[in-house]
Amino acid sequence: MKKYVLFLFLLQIPMFAQWNTSAIKLGTFIPSSAGAGFMVGYEGGHFFDPQFSLGWSIDWFHANYTDAQVVNDLNGIPLDQIPGTTGSTNELRAKTNIHDFPIMALATVRFPVTPLSDVYINGGLGFEALFIDYSNYQNPSQNDFKTAFDFNWTLGVGGTYGFSKKAEVFAELGYHSSAPSWDYQVTDANGYKHTFQRTFDMSGMMLRAGVRFYY
């Protein structure tokens, strides 16, 4: 009997090592710079045992907003030093359209609750590519394009429910941190250059749900 039980246990080890997963996640991301917006992502993973997995993820977040920090920076320059400058013009200068792509390596630890459900904690490290379409500071009627990068990290908790042998639904709440930035200059009417750093604080809470498939 003991040999039979040992055989079954050893049989499970390679089976666990074969578990791969693919997941689609949809939800809301609330970064400090841009405010709440829609986020969609893909996650791949590999289980080394039923409670621990490593994986990777890529997400896409989009937002259209007026950057309050840019308005404050430009309002600090006397109005007569930038031709055509008014408070409303500075708001046009701060109109921003962003596409954010966090790419991360993830680790997840699960804790069984019932035969069909788990709770889990996960964390990740990676980098972020931020594509920004914004108004030209000297001529707000024209748009400029910029790309900014930064390292990022995330920490979250969630729960799963298996509705078949090879699929489960899940929901998770997490915190994401990154702050891509670059320096820009504005030349006033007297020829003086004012240098500012434009930082996109992409730190905030994420609430998402999705479906994960096993193969």
Please provide the spans of the model-predicted regions.
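Transmembrane beta-strand segments that form the barrel wall of outer-membrane beta-barrel proteins
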Residues: 20-40
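Predominantly the C-terminal beta-signal and adjacent terminal strand-loop region
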Residues: 66-67, 155, 163-215
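Extracellular loop and loop/strand-boundary signature of outer-membrane beta-barrel proteins
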Residues: 27-30, 89-95, 138-145, 193-198
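Sec-dependent N-terminal signal peptides
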Residues: 4-13
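Gram-negative (and chloroplast) outer-membrane scaffold detector with strong preference
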Residues: 45-138, 161-166, 202-215
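Outer-membrane beta-barrel translocator domains and adjoining extracellular loop/strand segments
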Residues: 35-40, 66-73, 131-141, 182-190
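Residues that define the transmembrane beta-barrel architecture of outer-membrane proteins
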Residues: 34-40, 97-103, 117, 143, ...
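Boundary at the C-terminal end of the N-terminal hydrophobic targeting segment
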Residues: 15-19
